């Protein structure tokens, strides 16, 4: 049975309380979540040498605000929406109507304001439930949304995230979590190994929007199918990696198992700590971001240490970016009265439990 601990983490200028909720299981895995942005602040994985915190974050609420309200927000650990990733030219059409959004990433719209929301929290059993609403017109999107995020910690060292969103008007939705992982517990992630179960990826343009071409990974630095160190092909002069700051910021099309409710999409491991992580999801894509601009974060990381380039990698399970501009992509439309559901599971292993990547 999971155990819960709640403690104060800060207060908004309006006097609203920011709390930290720590969930732990009998095996020693523990997760810290904030009611601000549904942020995953810490994941402590038990090892023979003691627990290792494998995610990036900040020590104070003020630092999260400083980060998230900057033009180069990292969205560190946050639940992202209304539309995770980009909407090209910050415009889309749904239900026969055209909507203009805030252009917050050049001329495009990126992620939205869910990371800066406060959520009501309930705890029961092994579950942390966070709920909020998004009013019609927020960021320019139509529809009043009811939002539900569940974090479920299991006894076999897995953290499952369930999303449930309903709308009273036709709209679009794309949700993810923007946690940065570092399975070494510090330093850069270039030597950590990663396998992505994807034979294809979305080609990007110089604004990190899909061109519409879905290309094979074979024979390119985008090929993670056999597993390799994250940094092995990161600096080869390949145009797709150079145009995003010398790294990866690309959506991979997951090779889905036939009839599977969740598919294994990624497997990462650290030789230093012996920690491995497998990622399963119901979503069609996973965005790999290797922290190419983390060094620009205006707020310090944990322990006051500045964020560094390649200091973490994100595996953002999601629908494809800019889907409203590409009718050939899986639809992100959410019709009035319908419910969007998706879930992702992170499963952690140590030593030889997981096999060798």
Task: Give each language-model segment a name.
Residues 2-357:
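An exposed, glycine/acidic-rich loop-and-rim segment of catalytic or binding clefts
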